[in-house]
């Protein structure tokens, strides 16, 4: 659960039952006409893995898509290309991967989640 789901600095995600990303936004999503107390909102933790073909498509656009520009979230360009994005739910705080040594920590978490 996010500490501050209204923060525009934290992209929020909505995922379907197949663990595919439906949408990501800096706005509070999913929205509701009613006030829902204690609603759990999920944030994006980035580990991107795309094949060469998908990356070539991404860079072939040469510029940000309209929705990518509005949200300032690069993963939305893959939406415009029709590329599905799989998600993994983490029940703990996010792990930063800023150095090579951090990769092993992240891989261990992913492996344990895939076994569930």
Each language-model region and where it sits:
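Conserved alpha/beta core of the MobA/IspD/sugar-nucleotide pyrophosphorylase nucleotidyltransferase superfamily
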Residues: 39-116
């Amino acid at each position: 659960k996010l500490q501050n789901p209204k923060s525009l600095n934290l992209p929020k995600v909505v995922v379907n039952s197949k663990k595919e990303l439906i949408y990501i936004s800096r706005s509070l999503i999913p929205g509701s006409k009613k006030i829902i107390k204690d609603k759990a909102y999920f944030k994006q933790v980035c580990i991107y893995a795309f094949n060469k073909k998908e990356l070539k498509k991404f860079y072939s656009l040469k510029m940000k898509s309209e929705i990518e520009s509005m949200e300032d979230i690069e993963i939305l360009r893959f939406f415009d290309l029709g590329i599905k994005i799989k998600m993994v739910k983490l029940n703990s705080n996010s792990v930063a991967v800023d150095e090579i040594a951090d990769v092993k920590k992240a891989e261990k978490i992913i492996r344990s989640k895939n076994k569930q």
